């Protein structure tokens, strides 16, 4: 994995990442013209997981890097008890939280979703935290961009799925790791 930025301290990383989420032009776009597109896209993804018995109604779900919360709303509409975190909170939907230090008890969630792997400064810590908060029989879906030019807020670039990502899962069984059609959020690979 290639790291794209160097910081003298962790606060510099957080400040850099917050710039994207706090950008008023981006936020307005996420909350208006992209809201329905992303909400419908997430509902499709999660509906497929329900149909395939990966998810069940009333399960507890956590969305990491949820920004303005479309994935949370989608999961709630499908009957899950969903919450989300981001380094910048959003109204009642998204709580302030750090993907590298999840403030939840061990085995708290049946499902964890994230599509911000590329924004992780410490991917091994992010995956370790996901595994810690997942229940033993829980599922995690991570979607990301592979071999697609990143923006200035990406912290890492995946060079090898097996080495850079799959090897980080120490307590999990990989159900699939596969290419997907580039979706509404620009993601083209997913791991379940």
Predicted region positions:
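Class I SAM-dependent methyltransferase SAM/SAH-binding core
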Residues: 60-101
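Conserved class I S-adenosyl-L-methionine
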Residues: 141-170
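A short acidic, Gly/Pro-enriched loop at the edge of an enzyme's catalytic core
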Residues: 100-112
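A short glycine-rich, Lys/Arg-flanked "PGG" loop and its adjoining helix->strand segment in the class I
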Residues: 124-139
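Class I SAM-dependent methyltransferase Rossmann-like catalytic core
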Residues: 1-53
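Core SAM-dependent methyltransferase catalytic element
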Residues: 172-192
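A short SAM/SAH-binding and catalytic strip from SAM-dependent methyltransferases
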Residues: 110-123
């Amino acid at each position: 994995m290639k790291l794209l930025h160097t910081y003298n301290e962790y606060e510099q990383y957080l400040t850099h990442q917050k710039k994207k989420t706090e950008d008023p032009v981006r936020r307005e776009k996420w909350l208006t013209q992209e809201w329905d597109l992303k909400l419908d896209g997430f509902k499709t993804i999660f509906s497929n997981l329900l149909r395939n018995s990966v998810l069940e109604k009333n399960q507890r779900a956590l969305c990491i890097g949820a920004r303005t919360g479309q994935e949370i709303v989608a999961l709630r509409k499908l009957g899950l008890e969903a919450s989300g975190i981001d380094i910048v909170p959003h109204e009642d939907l998204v709580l302030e939280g750090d993907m590298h230090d999840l403030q939840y008890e061990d085995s708290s969630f049946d499902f964890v979703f994230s599509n911000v792997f590329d924004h992780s400064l410490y991917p091994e810590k992010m995956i370790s935290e996901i595994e810690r908060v997942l229940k033993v029989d829980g599922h995690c879906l991570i979607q990301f961009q592979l071999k697609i030019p990143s923006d200035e807020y990406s912290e890492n670039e995946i060079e090898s799925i097996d080495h850079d990502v799959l090897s980080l899962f120490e307590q999990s069984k990989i159900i699939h790791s596969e290419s997907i059609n580039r979706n509404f959020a620009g993601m083209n690979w997913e791991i379940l």
